[in-house]
């Protein structure tokens, strides 16, 4: 699958331009798909907030055959109902099955005192949409930022114990019922391929702990991930 991101890669001042580019991208893909023998991945749009779901769909609704669904960043108790409701509104406007991929990365999961309750309530929100949930994702960098830490190129997310424990709690609650993908590895270039060695090391622990797949942010990462899974 591939994600077209309208969230943290886009400045507030550029949202309108990004939406126009999104529409143009789908037009280009539609023409390529119609005139060439090409295989496309499942294409998802990562929205900024629940309100943007309907705006995005209006832009690309005529390209239903290319579009697989939405990614919901910072899915939390504060916005889960709105995300779910807006998604169902879009779903009711199409005869095609769309999917959602919530990202668990919000501050309310970080607080250890409330984490168990929050995770259980979040699972209930996601269970309400179970037939439409293709994947549950996690925000490793957001969690690291919350603790004021960052893994280096020769370390894995599992070396950061507070984050590792948090990811473990998410897997404990969700992995028996959902596919949960591993967190982003932020390195994709270095001398002597240290970044690839580090990514392979982290992928080993991802698989060991029950993550399925890995979010990539650069084409260099794709063959490393594919070869390791």
What are these regions (language model features)?
Residues 1-229:
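Expand to "…catalyze enediolate/carbanion chemistry for C-C bond making/breaking, isomerization
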């Amino acid at each position: 699958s591939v994600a077209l991101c309208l969230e943290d890669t886009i400045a507030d001042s550029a949202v309108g331009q990004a939406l126009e580019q999104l529409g143009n991208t789908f037009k280009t893909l539609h023409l390529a798909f119609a005139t060439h023998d090409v295989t496309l991945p499942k294409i998802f749009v990562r929205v900024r907030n629940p309100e943007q779901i309907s705006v995005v769909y209006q832009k690309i609704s005529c390209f239903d055959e290319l579009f697989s669904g939405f990614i919901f960043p910072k899915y939390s108790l504060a916005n889960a109902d709105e995300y779910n409701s807006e998604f169902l509104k879009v779903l009711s406007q199409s005869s095609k099955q769309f999917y959602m991929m919530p990202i668990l990365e919000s501050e309310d999961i970080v607080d250890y005192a409330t984490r168990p309750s929050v995770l259980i309530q979040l699972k209930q929100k996601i269970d309400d949409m179970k037939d439409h949930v293709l994947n549950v994702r996690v925000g490793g960098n957001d969690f690291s930022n919350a603790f004021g830490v960052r893994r280096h190129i020769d370390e894995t997310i599992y070396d950061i114990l507070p984050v590792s424990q948090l990811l473990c709690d998410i897997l404990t609650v969700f992995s028996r019922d959902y596919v949960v993908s591993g967190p982003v590895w932020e390195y994709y270039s270095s001398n002597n391929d240290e970044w690839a060695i580090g990514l392979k090391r982290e992928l080993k622990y991802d698989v060991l702990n029950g993550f399925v797949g890995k979010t990539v942010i650069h084409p260099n990462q794709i063959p490393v991930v594919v070869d390791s899974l």
